[in-house]
Design a protein with these regions (language model features):
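Extracytoplasmic thiol/disulfide redox context detector
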Residues: 1-97, 174-181, 215-220
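Short, flexible active-site loop motifs that bind/organize anionic cofactors or intermediates
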Residues: 6, 54, 136, 150, ...
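C-terminal cap of thioredoxin/glutaredoxin-like
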Residues: 19-21, 25, 151-220
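Short acidic/polar alpha-helix capping motifs at helix-coil junctions
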Residues: 36-42, 110-114, 160
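A broad, low-specificity signal for short, low-complexity segments enriched in glycine/proline
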Residues: 46-50, 72, 108-109, 155-160
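Structural alpha/beta surface segment adjacent to cysteine/selenocysteine redox centers
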Residues: 65-143
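Surface-exposed, polar/charged faces of alpha-helical domains
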Residues: 118-121, 144-151, 158-162
Length: 220
């Protein structure tokens, strides 16, 4: 009897599973990432999401890293629910010498966004990872290191490979100039990063309010 019970216990603990062939497939209904119409922004989320914001950011900006640390999870959550679309507008004004740190990171973001099947939540996680591991005024991550972060964030293998190869996806000089001009238009008094702009109300967001994201989402 003990042997029978032991066998039953083992069966209950292990259970029966049906082998699944192949790899997990992305949700066809999940929000994706794309390059904005003007060519210099990166939009993560549905085009018809009820809340639309722009975030002006510099890859070496420590305050931008603080922003991602504080609300990165929240941004990913609302993007995944289809309630929020975030358009990132990278800038490179902290680049010095020939290192091209901010330009390299910005280009990698455009590589990811230009891939038709890049999941928006994975893109947001990629952004968080890049800003969480900064090297201000240093060399910054190389293409292989950036590609590793892209893979860990869940971006497609094609994106990871293109980043690792150093594929060019945007003219970062033109990108920086265009996004600076746009930042000046939305907030001529403070042309710094991070700046969050509410596209629904045409107003800058007070990101020093600890509950700004929740308030923004509840107002939609």
């Amino acid at each position: 009897m003990m042997a029978v019970l032991t066998g039953l216990t083992l069966l209950a603990g292990v259970g029966c599973t049906k082998p699944i062939q192949g790899s997990a497939q992305p949700d066809p209904d999940a929000p994706l990432t794309q390059v904005s119409e003007d060519g210099y922004g990166l939009t993560a989320g549905f085009a018809d999401a009820p809340v639309q914001i722009e975030i002006f950011a510099e890859p070496q900006c420590s305050h931008c890293a603080d922003l991602q640390r504080d609300v990165g999870d929240g941004l990913a959550h609302y993007i995944g629910l289809g309630q929020l679309a975030v358009t990132y507008r990278p800038m490179t004004f902290l680049d010095t010498g020939d290192l091209g740190y901010s330009a390299r990171v910005s280009n990698a973001l455009f590589v990811a966004a230009s891939q038709p099947d890049s999941p928006a939540v994975a893109f947001q996680r990629f952004v968080e990872a890049l800003w969480a591991d900064q090297d201000p005024s240093g060399r910054g991550p190389d293409d292989d290191e950036i590609a590793e972060k892209a893979g860990a964030a869940g971006l497609p293998e094609d994106v990871v490979g293109r980043i690792a190869r150093g594929e060019t996806a945007v003219d970062t000089v033109e990108m920086d100039a265009a996004n600076y001009d746009l930042l000046y238009l939305v907030d001529p008094m403070y042309t710094g990063t991070p700046t969050v702009y509410n596209l629904n109300t045409d107003e800058t967001v007070d990101i020093y309010d600890a509950d700004w994201l929740d308030k923004l989402m509840s107002s939609a």
